[in-house]
C-alpha cells in the first residue's frame, strides 16, 4: 500500500533519487516484509500469479527472494525483515444510537477531541462519546482497514520459512511493521538499522528518508505505487544494482508553506494503508486537492468537520472512525523497545488513557516477545486482543455461498429447480459444518492461550464475524472444564528418555518426524516415562525439572497437540484414529507427513467425503460413480506437492469445486498450525520450560506444521488423468490408454515435466492413505459404508492397470 497519488507529486517535482547499491555497503537494511512481498506480486506476470495461487509453494517467489538476498550479500548489506504482527481487527466502543440533534452533537463533540492543534487534548484525546451515558447503546464489532490482508498471510508464512532456511534474521512487530521500523531507525540513541525499505506510508510515522524500490541483478524494477504505470516489470541494465529513495524534507519544501503535520494531514486525506480517501476529494491528483483543503482549513480535522453536515451520517461516521484510527496508529503506533517492553514510542504522559480502543486489550510483554521471535502466530492472539475475528466462512462464501444464492429461488420461481435448491442447501450445510470444525480449533487454541493469563482474558467474549457480516456473528466459546492444559500437562518428555530416532531430527535441525512421534507410543517403557512424575504442575506450581532443550519443548508440545486432536488418549496410548494415522505415515515421504495429518483430520471430521454409488443395492465396481471417484481422487491429490519447471504456462482448466476444497484444506491446515503454536505458548507460559534455554530459531525449524505442502495443480493433473483413462475404451490395451493420457497431460500442463512420474508419486501417496484406511477398519474408526466406497475406489484404480 502507498499514499494515493503521492507518486504523481514525486514525479512532478522530480523527487526520486537514485543511488548505487554499492554505496550502502556494510549497513543494516530494515525491510517492510509485507510491502516487499506486495512489490514482488505486482511484478509477476498473470501466469506467475496463477502459479502462485494454485501451489502450496512458489519456486518463482523463492527464486526472486534468493536473488534479492544474494545481491545484498554481495554488497555486504545485512537485511532485517520486519513483518506485521497482531491484525488490527477490533471491537469498537459504544456508538450512541440517538435520534436527531443529540446524535449529531455527540458525534461532533467526540470528533473535536481529535483536533491536533487543540491544546486540551492530552489525556482524554481518544475518549469515545464522552457526553453520552455509558449504557445508552451496545458495542458493535467492526473490522479495521489494515495493510496486512488475508491473502498475504500464507505468503508471509512461506517467506518466514524460507528466511529461516537461509539463516536470515526477521522480526515480527507487535502490530504494524512500519511503526516498528520507524522505531528501529529513529526511536533509539543508537539506531538498530541504517535505512528502511518500505512504502511511502512511512512518512506517517516520521520517517523522512527511506528506500522505495530496488534494482537487483535480475534488472527487475518494482515501483512503490501499485497503481502507477511503472508497476509493470521493466528491464533497465543501466540501473543495475541500484535503489531509489525518497527525501521527505525535500517534498515538504514543495508544498508551498505547509508544516510537516499539515503535510501528513494531507496524506491521510488522500488515502493510505491505514486510512481511506476523504470522500470530498476527487480527481487524479488527490494530494494537491488534499493540500488545498488543509491549507484552507488549517488541518485535516477542521476540513472533515466542515463537511460533516454535507455527508450522509453513515458515511461520515464510518470515515470518522477510520480517521481516528489513522491518527492513533501514526502517532501512537505500539512498538517493542530495546528493553523488550511493548509501548507507544512517545512519553507516557502524552499517551491517551483509552488507546486500547484502537489497539485492543494489552497483553503481557512476554507474549509480545514470543510473537517478535516468530514462535507464536498472530491470528488467535488478534482475536483475544480485539474480541472478534473474521469468520473463515468468508473463504467459502466466494464459491459455495454465491452458488447457494444462485440456487435459491423466491416468489413464483420457488421450487422450479429442486436440483439446484438441494445443491444449495447441501452447500450451506457443508459450509456451516466446516466453520464449526474450525471454531472448535479456535476454541481449543484460545483456551490454551488464556488459561495461564489473567481471568479477564479467560472470561473475554470472542465474536466470530460471519463473512465480515456484523449481523450474523457467533460467540466462540473457549471455556473448558477442566482447562485443556490440565488434561495435557502430564506430557513432560525428557531427553534422557528419548529413543535415538526421535532426537536425531533436532541434531539435523529438521522438523520432527510425526511417524516417529506416534510409533514411540508403542513402546511401553517410553509411555511410562512420558508421564510427569509431579502432580498439578502449572504457573503457580512449576515442575522441579523443567523442560530445558528444544527437543524436550517441541516433543512435549507435539504430544499435547496429538492428544487434543484425538489421536492420543490421556493414557498416552493411540486412539482408534491414532493407529490409522500411524499406519499411513509409516511409508509416507517426510515432506508429506503434515499433509497426511491434515488429510486424516478432514476424513475424521467428514469434510473429505467419500465417492458415491450409483446404486445402493450392491457394492461392486460397476456401482461406483466414476465421476464422483475421480473428484475424490483429485481432492486427495491436492495434499501432494508438484514440482514445476521455471517457465510458466497459463492453466486453462478451472474446477470450482476442487478450488473450493483446496482453499478449505489449506485454511484448515493453517489453523492447525495456529493451534500447534498455542500449545507451545501454553507450555512456556505455564512455566513448564526453563525460559533461559529457549532457542526460537531452532524451535521454528523443528516444530511441525510450519510449511504444509500441497498443490491445486496436482489435483488438476490427477483429475484430468483419470477422466481420460476412464473414457478411453477404444485403444487396444490399457497401457496404450495410459500412455495416451500421459501425452495429453504433458500437453495441457507443460510445466510439470513427466506426467508419469507425478502419477506414480500420487499412487504411492494413495497407497499410504489406503494403508491407514485399512487400519481404520480394524479399529472401527470409519463406518462400513464409507469403507466399502473407499475400497471400491481402490479396486477401480488398480483395474485400470496402474
Curated annotation (Swiss-Prot):
In the record, the effect of residue 201 to A is given as: Normal chromatin silencing by small RNA
Q: What happens when the gene is disrupted?
A: Abnormal establishment of heterochromatin. Increased level of RNA-DNA hybrids.
One of the entry's Gene Ontology molecular-function terms is:
mRNA 3'-UTR binding
**CDD domains assigned:** PIN_MKT1 (cd09858)
Which key words tag this protein in UniProt?
Phosphoprotein, Translation regulation
Coiled-coil residue windows: none
This protein's GO CC annotations: cytosol; nucleus
In this chain, where does the modification Phosphoserine occur? Answer: 227-228, 230
Whom does it interact with, and what assembly results? Interacts with pab1 binding protein ath1.
Q: What is this protein called?
A: Post-transcriptional regulator mkt1
